[in-house]
Design a protein with these regions (language model features):
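Auxiliary Fe-S-binding modules of radical SAM enzymes
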Residues: 2-15, 32, 62-66, 72-74, ...
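Canonical Radical SAM [4Fe-4S] cluster-binding loop centered on the CxxxCxxC motif
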Residues: 14-60
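Short, charge-rich binding segments
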Residues: 18, 70-73, 99-104, 128-131
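Alpha-helical elements of the RecA-like P-loop NTPase motor core of helicases
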Residues: 38, 147, 191
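Core AdoMet radical
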Residues: 45-59, 75-90, 105-121, 125, ...
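Conserved strand-to-helix beginnings and helix N-cap segments that scaffold or border functional pockets
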Residues: 91-95, 122-123, 190-193
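Alpha-helix-loop-beta-strand connector modules within alpha/beta enzyme cores
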Residues: 94-107, 163-175
Length: 207
């Protein structure tokens, strides 16, 4: 998670599962991740926008649904899986929740680092996301080369950069609306990152 453009003062309450921002409702379902990014907000704060995202334990699917039902979900532009961790570390729960939200006619986005097929090498993760009804995926690229990516994002798996790019290509091929993002840092050649994204057919956004 990007440490820039974020309010870092948070309360000390138990970590929240949902939080509203920018007209969207964001879902924080895990603190587990597959990388240790040098720019991660977790190194500076326990949350964003005044919300504590440091979960004391992972909520069950039922707990997440119960929390969602407290909201007028149709009032939000998007329901976004994001949070302090990588949502695809809970792939089966993620798929179930996307399907539940889509049955209510809601627009669902996944913010991800694109490492899912390294976590589940015997599954076609993108196809499963498509089948669940996912509308949009936002993939953190954060670097124009594998070497820089490894230095900035410090992924746990080998070949994470190429796997992330392949995830983007598969999402586009599956007709999932796909956006590639980078954190604007001096080390990153944003223009080159944009070229890579556009060559693949993805939208591009600087966080």
């Amino acid at each position: 998670m990007n440490s820039k453009k974020i309010i870092t003062d948070t309360n000390n309450e138990k970590g929240v599962i949902t939080y509203p921002a920018h007209g969207n409702l964001y879902l924080n379902i895990t603190n587990r991740c597959t990388a240790e990014c040098t720019f991660c907000i977790r190194d500076l704060s326990n949350g964003v926008y005044g919300y504590n995202l440091n979960l004391s334990e992972e909520p069950s699917v039922d707990e997440i649904v119960n929390e969602l039902e407290k909201h007028n979900l149709s009032a939000y532009r998007e329901i976004v899986f994001t949070g302090f961790g990588e949502p695809t570390t809970r792939l089966d729960d993620l798929l179930h929740l996307i399907s539940w939200l889509k049955k209510k006619g809601l627009y669902v986005r996944l913010d991800t680092n694109g490492h899912a097929e390294l976590l589940y090498p015997h599954r076609d993760v993108v196809s499963e996301l498509k089948d669940s009804g996912l509308d949009e995926v936002s993939v953190s690229m954060n670097a124009e080369s594998e070497d820089l990516y490894n230095r900035l994002c410090r992924p746990y798996h080998k070949n994470a950069y190429s796997a992330m790019l392949e995830f983007v290509k598969k999402a586009i091929a599956a007709d999932i609306k796909t956006r590639v993002t980078v954190v604007g840092m001096p080390e990153v050649n944003v223009e080159k990152c944009q070229q890579i994204a556009e060559q693949m057919g993805a939208d591009f956004y600087v966080r």
